[in-house]
């Protein structure tokens, strides 16, 4: 389950912690349930709630939240596409587990569309290794954080028009019609 995956990551990265509460949708009751799950692993003290919520909209992430985390880990089941897209746009790498069911693959699909296939893990073991590897190289992570937002401006996820134009041209060719040059 998700807590087991995250607990294993915490065990392999002693400096890491989990910060929940990217949106106001995570209230104190939900946070208590999350923290309780990690108590079984002896890791409850490394689970924190983002305390600086300036927004009340359940879907808006406080921009300061993105400065407080190094990576966003999507374990599949409860993927929030808006938060995943926000994370990438704000320069935070999203490491995603490609699940079995279509809904469990939503985060992975967004990460692929953001031109980051190396951030998608096929198995839970792959996700754990990927996360530990990325968190272990502070220099590379810092560089990624500095350049990711600018790179996302060109990614299909945030810039779909060139792809749509390409598909339109392919359809026109299939129909035997003239393809515009612009």
Feature locations, PLM:
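Conserved catalytic-core segment of nucleotide-activated headgroup transferases in glycan assembly
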Residues: 1-59, 173, 180
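Short, solvent-exposed polar/charged micro-motifs at secondary-structure junctions
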Residues: 29-30, 57-63, 128-134
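Short acidic alpha-helix that forms the nucleotide-activated donor recognition element
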Residues: 55-69, 89
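Catalytic binding pocket for nucleotide-activated donors in carbohydrate/polymer assembly enzymes
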Residues: 71, 75-160
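C-terminal alpha-helical cap of glycosyltransferases
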Residues: 159-182
């Amino acid at each position: 389950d998700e807590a087991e995956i995250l607990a294993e990551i915490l065990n392999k990265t002693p400096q890491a912690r989990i910060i929940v509460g990217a949106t106001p949708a995570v209230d104190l009751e939900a946070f208590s349930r999350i923290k309780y799950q990690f108590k079984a692993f002896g890791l409850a003290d490394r689970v924190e709630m983002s305390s600086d919520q300036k927004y009340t909209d359940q879907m808006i992430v406080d921009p300061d939240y993105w400065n407080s985390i190094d990576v966003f880990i999507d374990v599949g089941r409860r993927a929030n596409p808006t938060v995943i897209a926000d994370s990438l746009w704000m320069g935070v790498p999203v490491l995603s587990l490609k699940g079995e069911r279509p809904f469990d693959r939503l985060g992975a699909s967004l990460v692929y569309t953001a031109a980051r296939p190396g951030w998608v893990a096929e198995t839970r073991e792959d996700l754990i290794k990927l996360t530990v590897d990325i968190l272990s190289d502070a220099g590379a992570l810092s560089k990624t954080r500095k350049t990711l937002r600018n790179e996302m401006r060109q990614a299909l996820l945030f810039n779909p028009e060139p792809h749509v134009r390409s598909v339109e041209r392919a359809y026109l060719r299939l129909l035997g019609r003239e393809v515009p040059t612009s």
